[in-house]
């Protein structure tokens, strides 16, 4: 990766992967529009604690020389919110921004209904979701958002998996775009990419 271009870090959701639709659409858009950035989509492990350590190491190293712009989808939005706050603990002036997309607000509560065998159908990984996973997620909850102006919430009212109203309250001090209808996968994501990039930086807006 370049050491000077902005880093766009995409954090995927529960049992998802870098091969998911939004990850691929964003990567293709950045490539075809020749957006001056580096794009990274880490493949998350089943363990929240390990994911948090990996994401923090990646982002903190990048912030030594360039801005970091984070996108988090569903459970990835929960990770991303923790990550941004953790980075701001190191330096409250770090150039970091966040766009959570249909984010999970308290995923540890939802996971009570998913305890037991799980399978990631993208990579075939099978594992057991346990109370230890839930406890690790609880440790990543942050009580307050210290740079709300640097967070843009994207949510759709038709989300069939998560209650969008909880995200509206969680990110109430942040800029928000709430679309009527849609679904958990966030319909029309590709058309929303320019909105995300312009929020991150004018330098990332596609040239006409």
Which role does the model predict for each range below?
Residues 94-208:
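The alpha/beta-hydrolase serine catalytic core
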Residues 82-86:
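Active-site signature of alpha/beta-hydrolase-fold catalytic machinery across serine-
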Residues 55-59, 80, 192, 196, ...:
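Generic hydrophobic alpha-helical segments
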Residues 71-81:
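Gly/Ala-rich beta-loop-alpha elbow adjacent to hydrolase catalytic centers
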Residues 1-3, 207-208:
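Eukaryotic N-terminal low-complexity, Ser/Thr- and Lys/Arg-rich leader segments
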Residues 67-72, 99:
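Short beta-strand immediately N-terminal to the catalytic nucleophile in serine-hydrolase-like folds
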